């Protein structure tokens, strides 16, 4: 079945990138009948709910950086970023079947990626300037995982939903960070978090009772 990326939300996507996204969507649709990469009801809305959502991050990523995407699953957002930028992307995915999908999709679209088929906490990779994740875990856990390989001058980009402020409050108990909030262009309840200057709260800085 030939799958064409839908044009809505896709204005400004170069033809070469659109062709790669079409090929990626074809492969994802085929694999989704065997393993759960996205909800079956989302297949007809891959552009709006998944691809365009992840493409928002491309303009926020500096040229040529090393980037780690945690819990890459169906390729969101890491493989989309690899197609849309020149970042050196590492995809971390512990599910072996999903990692196999990522390998096939990356080869088919010519994406520059390294795939680590291990748990995030067991991934042994050099420091990266950017860490990304989408629909993976609450912010405190994302920051804990990121701390293993985020460079001191690096930052995180996380796609978050309506509970973002609660997650930021919870994370502030253990982490100092400079927070930038960018409204999602594809999800009315969504927020892109850019977190920099991240460091763990020292015991002496904790509020009484924590």
Swiss-Prot record:
SUPFAM superfamilies, A to Z: S-adenosyl-L-methionine-dependent methyltransferases
GO molecular function (one): rRNA (guanine-N7-)-methyltransferase activity
GO cellular component annotations of the record: cytosol
Keyword Methyltransferase in annotation: yes
Highest taxon of the lineage: Bacteria
Enzyme class at the top of the EC tree: transferase
Catalytic reaction annotation: guanosine(527) in 16S rRNA + S-adenosyl-L-methionine = N(7)-methylguanosine(527) in 16S rRNA + S-adenosyl-L-homocysteine
Cited Pfam families: GidB (PF02527)
UniProt main location, coarse: cytoplasm
Keywords linked to the UniProt accession: Cytoplasm, Methyltransferase, rRNA processing, S-adenosyl-L-methionine, Transferase
Residues involved in S-adenosyl-L-methionine binding: 71, 76, 120-121, 134
Protein's UniProt keywords contain ATP-binding: no
InterPro entries per the UniProt record, alphabetical: rRNA_ssu_MeTfrase_G, SAM-dependent_MTases_sf
EC number: 2.1.1.170
Coiled-coil ranges per UniProt: none
Function recorded in the entry: Specifically methylates the N7 position of guanine in position 527 of 16S rRNA.
Family the entry assigns: Belongs to the methyltransferase superfamily. RNA methyltransferase RsmG family.
PANTHER family named among the record's database cross-references: S-ADENOSYL-L-METHIONINE-DEPENDENT METHYLTRANSFERASES SUPERFAMILY PROTEIN
Protein name: Ribosomal RNA small subunit methyltransferase G
Organism from which the protein derives: Gluconacetobacter diazotrophicus (strain ATCC 49037 / DSM 5601 / CCUG 37298 / CIP 103539 / LMG 7603 / PAl5)
Gene name in the database record: rsmG
């Amino acid at each position: 079945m030939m799958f064409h990326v839908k044009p809505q939300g896709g204005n400004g996507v170069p033809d070469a990138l659109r062709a790669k996204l079409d090929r990626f969507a074809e492969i994802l649709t085929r694999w989704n009948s065997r393993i759960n990469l996205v909800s079956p009801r989302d297949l007809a809305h891959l552009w709006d709910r998944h691809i365009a959502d992840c493409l928002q991050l491309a303009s926020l990523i500096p040229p040529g950086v090393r980037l780690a995407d945690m819990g890459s699953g169906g390729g969101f957002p890491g493989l989309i970023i690899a197609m849309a930028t020149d970042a050196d992307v590492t995809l971390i995915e512990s599910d072996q079947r999903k990692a196999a999908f990522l390998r096939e999709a990356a080869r088919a679209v010519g994406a520059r990626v390294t795939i680590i088929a291990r748990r995030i906490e067991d991934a042994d990779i050099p420091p990266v300037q950017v860490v990304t994740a989408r629909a993976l875990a609450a912010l405190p856990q994302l920051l804990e995982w990121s701390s293993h390989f985020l460079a001191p001058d690096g930052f995180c980009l996380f796609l978050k939903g309506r509970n973002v402020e609660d997650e930021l409050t919870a994370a502030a108990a253990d982490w100092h960070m400079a927070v930038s909030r960018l409204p999602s262009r594809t999800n009315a309840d969504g927020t892109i978090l850019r977190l920099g200057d991240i460091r763990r709260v020292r015991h002496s800085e904790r509020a009484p009772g924590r």
